[in-house]
Amino acid sequence: MNVLSCSTNTLKGLYDISGVEVGQHFYWQIGGFQVHGQVLITSWVVIAILLGSASIAVRNPQTIPNDSQNFFEYVLEFIRDVSKTQIGEEYGPWVPFIGTMFLFIFVSNWSGALLPWKIIELPHGELAAPTNDINTTVALALLTSVAYFYAGLTKKGLSYFSKYIQPTPILLPINILEDFTKPLSLSFRLFGNILADELVVVVLVSLVPLVVPIPVMFLGLFTSGIQALIFATLAAAYIGESMEGHH
């Protein structure tokens, strides 16, 4: 009963976290729900960029690849390597999921540093990178949770749940709690780093408009890429762990 109560409280905590607000927001009413409109707008822009890049990548493939084809093949090979390293030999079906996670987060993070979101005026609030909103990061983390539960159940069936009593049944509450804290750690890490990076740049630009913020912006681009890689790597690692057993 205590375990069930802990799990319920953790899920309620995730729901409450999705209501955390930083700055002003532009709200839409969709089906009786209040959503952050600026997150949907910037997410659609990121998705459009990814779809446009994908259409370019598959258009007129050459036997001898040109520069753009080489670049996209390198990105695909990189994602496959990350998936294979973390998941193992059965990584193939998970490459699209891991790749989508990595590319969406990567482009979202970079859009916050490269695109002039602030010059676009809204009735209320302001535009920012999708990953600058905790609703986005919590949603990505919950998708990862669904993915590794699905991977474990597909591979092992109901015997997947036996991992919760390994190596001893005494650890049952801790093992259950661990699965519910994984989304929290993923979402907080990504949200905190991206928000902090954008806040530092905004403060420096307001204090010293020229020259000084440029190195910080380059550092932000680097850390944004690292955060996307960390998220995708951990997502793949969780999926691999659920398929192989408790480590």
Swiss-Prot record:
Membrane-crossing residue ranges in chain numbering: 38-58, 95-115, 134-154, 199-219, 220-240
Membrane topology type: Multi-pass membrane protein
Protein's UniProt keywords contain Membrane: yes
Key words, A-Z: ATP synthesis, CF(0), Chloroplast, Hydrogen ion transport, Ion transport, Membrane, Plastid, Thylakoid, Transmembrane, Transmembrane helix, Transport
Gene Ontology MF annotations: proton-transporting ATP synthase activity, rotational mechanism
CDD domains for this protein: ATP-synt_Fo_a_6
Compartments where located: Plastid, Chloroplast thylakoid membrane
Xref: InterPro entries: ATP_syn_F0_a_bact/chloroplast, ATP_synth_F0_asu, ATP_synth_F0_asu_AS, F0_ATP_A_sf
Family the entry assigns: Belongs to the ATPase A chain family.
Function: Key component of the proton channel; it plays a direct role in the translocation of protons across the membrane.
Protein name as catalogued: ATP synthase subunit a, chloroplastic
Species of origin: Eucalyptus globulus subsp. globulus (Tasmanian blue gum)
